[in-house]
Amino acid sequence: MNIHEYQAKEILRKYGVPTSTGLVVTQTEKINETIDKLNTEVYVVKAQIHAGGRGKAGGVKVVKSKEEAKKVAHDMFGINLVTHQTGPQGQKVNRLYIESGCDILKEYYFSIVFDRSASCITFIASTEGGVDIEEVAEKTPEKIIKFSVDPATGLQDFHMRGIAYELGFKDNQAKQMKEIVKSVYNAFIETDAAQIEINPLIVNSDGHLLALDAKITFDDNGLLRHPNITAMRDHDEEDPLETRAANAGLSYVKMDGNIGCMVNGAGLAMATMDIIKLYGASPANFLDVGGGADRERVKEALKIILSDKEVQGILVNIFGGIMRCDIIAEGIIAAAKDIGIKVPLVVRLAGTNVEKGEEILSNSGLEIIPAHDLADAANKIVEAIR
């Protein structure tokens, strides 16, 4: 789960991380009175969307008068902001964060992530802040600093000292950086975060370190322990089909292709998407119905897939272990009769009760294309939509 910048800063401040401060606006009629509450010479108006690249797209404006700030805020509120992360459709700006500006002497990058490949927590830092870290990693990888934390021992003093040293901090600033590392680590652990990113972390004209922008992504599996964080969820920033799927207990991610996929198991789902690409087409989604799906969940899964107007065909790939193939077959038939599947549908079943499932499908009277293995299924669905 993602949250907005102003929410991320609120959490970080609770853990002792110094951040820039401001006020959030969620209604256009509140813009003027909100800006009037700020006593500053420089105003920073920031669009609040769950995507990076806001500055380059015009979603962050720095102005030097109250009246100019009001005009910029009114112009920005409600627009469709298109960044390199939103795609061409953009994201509507329903919230603004208006901050007091500050003098910047130097910008840094600092983040903490769970590194799945190394099975540990990793700090990533760079003296090149305020730009895309991916660009820095590609062009000047030597400027990327990494420190891994063994989960068995946790954060140690040498991690904090090492990060401060590698970033070139000395004396009081080194002490500040060590405290920020400790605070960010504590926030990461205690909130079940998957990533905390501060970009940029700045040194201001007073020599103080400050988080000027912040992003936090949370592990969805840990949200049950954090109702206060769950309450920060902004459903307007999420794909409505993904929200609908989550409410139905389905794992769904919309993609840019035209072949809808319904699979049980994340690994099998990824293999299915890969083989669709191998045969010359693109998946429209990742959809894992899980191991305990019943007839109604299968029916809802197909409805969600067909709600995507880009879908020209559907590939169902089920390995019946915990899930029985006959249950899947009944769900497919129920969905087909209820909503009327008007695109090619290829079904590949294997495992528990596969013969019964195939019999149910063949006797349904519906135009369902059977497949014997994954390669056969991918070939048939790609040919069917051509």
Curated annotation (Swiss-Prot):
Per the record, what are the reactions this protein catalyses? succinate + ATP + CoA = succinyl-CoA + ADP + phosphate; GTP + succinate + CoA = succinyl-CoA + GDP + phosphate
Where is substrate bound in this sequence? 264, 321-323
EC class of this enzyme?
ligase
Enzyme Commission number(s) from the entry: 6.2.1.5
Name what cofactor the protein needs.
Mg(2+)
Q: What does the record say about how the cofactor binds?
A: Binds 1 Mg(2+) ion per subunit.
Extract the Gene3D superfamilies matched here.
ATP-grasp fold, A domain, ATP-grasp fold, B domain, Succinyl-CoA synthetase domains
Disulfide bridge map = none
Please cite one Gene Ontology biological process associated with this protein: tricarboxylic acid cycle
* Protein name per the record: Succinate--CoA ligase [ADP-forming] subunit beta
**Record organism:** Rickettsia peacockii (strain Rustic)
